[in-house]
Amino acid sequence: MKKYILILFALSLIVSCSQVTSTTFNGFGPRDFPITMGSQSSVDVVIAMDKLWEEGDFDGMREHISDSARFVWEDGRVHSREEFINSLKSDTLMYSWTFDWAFSVKDDNPQEINEWVNAGFNVVETTKSGDTLGRAHYNEWYLINKDGKISFWFNTKANR
């Protein structure tokens, strides 16, 4: 009996010490390659952009945006980097928001080194006098290039 207990104990020790492998991909893409998780450094670019946006440091955003970046708003407007920054500077409304999530995924093309970051925000839009104009959930996608800069951005809006 003692022998069986020792064998059982040894087996349980071996099983409990074996390394657990985790799946780093899921889903599918148009080229039949798996989708894999991206890096924290790409998420950090979006976090830095959000901080600058919240502080109103729109000129500071240039550091995180490639010269040839394109920004596509939920209403169809398309901006270059400078048009994007200028539109933020000239906006007459006030916004408050919660930054609810961000995660990064790699392109399904193994030759591609850009990463996509998805971020979610709940936004309240008000006038300067404090009158609430609307509430919405924004889902944003940022394409982070090999230099760690935003090269493409688009968002969707769900009024709530």
Language model features: what each stretch is:
Residues 85-130:
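Surface-exposed, charged secondary-structure patches
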Residues 32, 64, 68-79:
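A short gly/proline-enriched turn/hairpin at secondary-structure junctions
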Residues 1-4:
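Positively charged n-region of N-terminal signal peptides that target proteins for export
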Residues 18-55, 63:
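Short, low-complexity N-terminal intrinsically disordered segments enriched in polar/charged residues
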Residues 13-16:
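C-terminal motif of bacterial Sec signal peptides marking the signal peptidase cleavage site
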Residues 118, 133-139:
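Short, surface-exposed coil-to-beta transition loops
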